[in-house]
Regions:
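Beta-strand-loop-alpha-helix segment that lines the small-molecule cofactor/substrate pocket
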Residues: 1-27, 301
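Predominantly a Rossmann-like dinucleotide-binding segment in NAD(P)-dependent oxidoreductases
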Residues: 29-108, 114
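Alpha-helical elements of Rossmann-like donor-binding domains used by nucleotide-donor carbohydrate transfer enzymes
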Residues: 11, 33, 37-41, 51, ...
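C-terminal helix-rich "cap/oligomerization" subdomain common to oxidoreductases
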Residues: 129, 204-261
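N-terminal binding-site loop/beta-alpha segment at the start of enzyme catalytic domains
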Residues: 247-311
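NAD(P)-dinucleotide binding in Rossmann-like oxidoreductases
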Residues: 113-119, 129-207, 211-220
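Short glycine-enriched loops at secondary-structure junctions
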Residues: 2-3, 55-60, 283-285
Length: 311
């Protein structure tokens, strides 16, 4: 994904907008015509709630210093490939409801960890507000078909190359639709360019349109996916130093930025100018998020914090 956690993604999006700079997450499969076709079929033929099965799994034998399984390098199947099944589940449920995506309202996960407490494989059940359910899985020590199945009980979509979209089969792939009578319809997908070339073309077009975000991978989609990935990791207790504000090697909000000013006032007995705007400290998801928000508030000129936690 774009970053290790949702707080870092939030900070990048803020910088992108402040500096009028294009920021796009490199999810190649979302650009491909196959994915567009899947979402069109969902909108035309399926009704919520959906039942989704999505996997991205492979098996490799690598030392624990390898980036796939190294805690210090953000290793683990969830961040390496789990971001794919969780994103297509969100998109499919969104498409069934006439939206780009919907975020799950609950995530229950489990998995297998290595000696560094990094996930070698992970599975999760996602539940959505429309009662859709997605079962997803990622693994770097187990192989599977790595396919996607989406159904509403009447019509079913089967995707056997959801992530590479025919990249390794002469740029040709196929979708299968099965109705409740068992009748099958096959839809062939082919492109004259590779999946990564299509991704580069889309980025270039977005850049030349002077947009700061992609219409296919907007910022709120990337941020929502990262929040879901954070929750999935928390279920397995997979935690990186970058998730803990007190353990980060560098702050998310740079202290080299020129500090701004806010209107201030004086209170008798206190020798400091106090910002009239006070930061309420509740609703922080973790120390990482809290430190980033507090630093941002300080760099904007704030210096008064309300630390009460009961309202």
């Amino acid at each position: 994904p774009m970053t290790i956690n949702a707080t870092e993604t939030m900070a990048l999006i803020d910088l992108s907008r402040k500096n009028n700079t294009l920021l796009m997450e490199a999810f190649m499969y979302k650009i491909h015509p196959q994915t567009k076709k899947i979402m069109e079929i969902i909108q035309q033929k399926l009704n919520p709630p959906l039942n989704i099965n999505a996997e991205f799994c492979f098996s490799v034998d690598v030392p624990e210093t390898h980036r796939l399984v190294n805690r210090e390098l953000g290793g683990g199947s969830i961040l390496d490939i789990g971001c794919y099944p969780i994103s297509i589940a969100r998109h499919a449920v969104g498409a069934a409801n006439g939206k780009n995506f919907l975020n799950p309202i609950s995530i229950e996960g489990e998995g297998e960890l290595n000696s560094q407490e990094v996930d070698l494989n992970a599975s999760a059940i996602l539940k959505f507000e429309d009662e859709s359910v997605a079962k997803i899985k990622s693994a770097t020590n187990l192989s599977s078909e790595s396919d996607v199945r989406i159904t509403d009980g009447s019509n079913t979509i089967l995707v056997n190359q959801p992530w590479h979209c025919g990249e390794f089969t002469d740029r040709k792939s196929q979708l299968k639709i099965i109705d409740k009578e068992g009748n099958e319809e096959e839809i062939d997908i082919s492109t004259d360019k590779g999946i990564y070339a299509l991704e580069i073309d889309h980025f270039s077009e977005t850049f030349h349109s002077q947009s700061t975000e992609s219409r296919l991978i907007p910022h709120n989609d990337s941020h929502g996916n990262m929040i879901s990935l954070d929750t999935w990791r928390q279920e397995l207790r997979v935690v990186y130093d970058e998730d803990r504000g007190e353990r980060r090697k560098s702050p998310i909000i740079s202290n080299e930025i020129l500090r701004e000013t806010l209107p201030t006032l004086k209170i008798p007995g206190i020798d400091k100018e106090l910002s009239r705007l006070v930061f309420g400290c509740d609703n922080q998801s973790d120390t990482n998020h809290a430190f980033a928000m507090f630093d941002h508030f300080y760099m904007k000129g704030g210096n008064v914090f309300d630390t009460a936690y009961i309202y």
